[in-house]
Amino acid sequence: MAESILKSAKINRNVGQVLKSYLRVLKLSKKPSREEFLMISKVAGAGILVIGFVGFLIYVLLTEVPKWV
């Protein structure tokens, strides 16, 4: 019984430490400016398009190339 109490106290302490670190990060962070947000959005959108295009190329290669061989 004492072991379970110690275990739960240790878990509570760990949760408290994690929450403190999350709060510290939130305090240090700032809202991005409009220009920063637009740049991040463009880069993320370009990355999504590139990954989609690569996936489409792989799909075409795996479905059409076997027909030629």
From Swiss-Prot:
Q: Which family does it belong to?
A: Belongs to the SecE/SEC61-gamma family.
Which chain positions lie within coiled-coil regions? Answer: none
What are the recorded GO MF terms, alphabetically? protein transmembrane transporter activity
Its subcellular locations are: Cell membrane
Descriptive protein name: Protein translocase subunit SecE
InterPro entries named among the record's database cross-references: Prot_translocase_SecE_dom_sf, Translocase_Sec61-g, Translocase_SecE/Sec61-g
Q: How does it sit in the membrane?
A: Single-pass membrane protein
List, alphabetically, the Pfam families matched: SecE
